[in-house]
Amino acid sequence: MQLGAADTTVGINADRSPRWPRHVVGSITHSRTLVAVALARQSQVRAIGIDAEPIVAAADLEAIEHLCLTPRERQTLEEQSQLPRHMAVTAIFSAKEALYKCLYPLVQRYFDFQCAQIDLTGMADGVIHARLLHTLSPEFCAGYTITGSYLGQLDHTFTAFCLTW
């Protein structure tokens, strides 16, 4: 392994999160048709969160919007024409999943979709922004903003956040 860890399996913590080898941080994502893993040395990267989501089907759109979009995100979707609605909703959902995977190992607490707001205005350049609406820890307070990456490919949306030292 290029990260300096011996060959090993990824364990599962009591909270069902991955237990990475010592000195390694990472994130896992999967759908019915793909699996992806991002790994880094803990000495260089604090946390990583990645997500891959199939584009939300029209039949599921309203339920996903209700579950994961903030009122401001819904309003923004009404005003924007950058992406078809189902693709924008998928991107927001995916970004919140990636954000959770990135921050959970650092804050060690559950937080839901309403704890962050996603700004998609930079999507054309592959950039997304997440702003916390609630304080998760002394370091990650309401108003904290993190920049991530977005890629839309055929039938999937890919998002990622990475915190370096």
For every predicted segment, state its role.
Residues 1-165:
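Core catalytic alpha/beta fold that binds nucleotide/phospho-ligands
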